[in-house]
Amino acid sequence: MPNRIFIDTLFVIALINRRDQYHQQALDLAEQFEGDPLLVTDAVLLEIGNALARSYKQEAVEIIEQFLAAEEVEVVHLTPRLFAQGLTLYKSHQDKAWGLVDCISFIVMREAGVNQALTFDQHFVQAGFQALMREFPRT
């Protein structure tokens, strides 16, 4: 069984937005990892909904519902403990421009033993993870 891969907001935005500079790369990676076990947090799902609300709301609803229904996608729910851990990480890295949702993602990835993320976000690399969209060439 392949290792789980974390889904980040920036990947989903690139996947949905045809004008995004990473759109084709996101499509290619989605095809490459189709059926593989995936991991996402409901905080990321909230971020997806917010980011796509203006221009791609229907597409956001569809992909969020697909993630929630898919057997290969594990959705980690935000608990008070997880929020507190994420906030602690967020506060302790004043030298980084990491967002709170990213910090929560990093905690979840570490606890789940996940090293790869579908993202091009440099913050994941700074935190010691592989940002797959940075490693696979754009087409």
Task: Tell what function each PLM region has.
Residues H23-Q24, D42, V61, H77-P80, ...:
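Non-catalytic, surface-exposed connector residues within folded enzymatic/regulatory domains
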